[in-house]
Amino acid sequence: MAISPKKRALALVVVLIVAGAVAYYFLSRHHAPEKTVTIYGNIDIRQVQAAFDDNGRLLDLRVQEGDRVKKGQLLADLDPVRFQDAVDKDAAVWPRKSRCWRACWRVPVRKKSPRPGPKPAAAQATLSNAEITWQRQQALAARQYVPKQSLDNAAAALKTARANLDRAQQALTLAIKGPRKEDIAAARQQLQADKAGLSLARRELTDTRLYAPEDGVVQDRILEPGDMVSPQTPVFTLALDNPVWVRAYLPEKALGQVRLGMKATISSDSFPGKSFPGWVGFISPTAEFTPKTVQTTELRTELVYRVRVYACNPQHRLRLGMPVTVHIPLTDNQPQKL
């Protein structure tokens, strides 16, 4: 049965329409600008090693692995006995040293010298008597009326009397004029050093307690009670999961399309159908080659820029190191002020 020319023409028109639609679809798909930038990365791993500032024996651990801790929360204790003893020692001598300092700089300075006191006068009388005795023993020894030992004793007594007189005069001068400026300065410096020593002892006592430096989760409990610790020995490893961000790499051709503050959505194979809101918080100013650990659909030799996409993660579902996919819409996505 022959096909009529009318039907043949109609079929030809239908074929042309279908072919044109298919061609338009593929051409428009090829030339239409992308509406979303998709990049791949991992939740950045952030950790802190919690350690004491001094040496000592670990007395107690207050948290376990997996516990969520707050900044400033007590984590562990060192044996404080020797640190408390150091504080008690410095605190016991501090009042006496402080009183000596106050007595030193409060001595009045007199313009007129008073009459010699009884101590210099007594020392002067002792010296005069020692000189007379020395002269008498010297004359007797010249005639060999006394043994040489008596002459030596008289000489020693004379030297002692002179030294006592000098000491008494110096004490009188200090009582009259007060301490010298150099003595006051030295006493002040010594007092400051003692005060700093007491503060250091108290600080070392405070450092026998280990507090959490940031909010996080106890990832590793490295030591146990009874272990000896040092400032180089961490006691805990804390995983910091607030805030969390994605470390990803932006292709060079998309650099001009993505800006700081743009909204993004983050998805993970661990939560099918679930997306987490986020925003672009950092774009590296330096280009680099794609790291080997990053799995992307682009060529390995393509230049990329490291980006940081912050994620809203109130329930802590996004775990550190988790691989994720980031979608950054390019339409209706004005950068927000950070």
Curated annotation (Swiss-Prot):
One of its GO terms (cellular component) is periplasmic space. Keywords: Coiled coil, Periplasm, Signal. Residues 1-23 form the signal peptide. InterPro entries: CusB_D23, UPF0194_transport. Residues 148-207 form a coiled coil. It is found in: Periplasm. Pfam families: HlyD_D23. Gene3D superfamilies: 2.40.30.170, 2.40.50.100, Helix hairpin bin. Its main location: periplasm. Belongs to the UPF0194 family. This is UPF0194 membrane protein in asrC 5'region. It comes from Acidithiobacillus ferridurans.
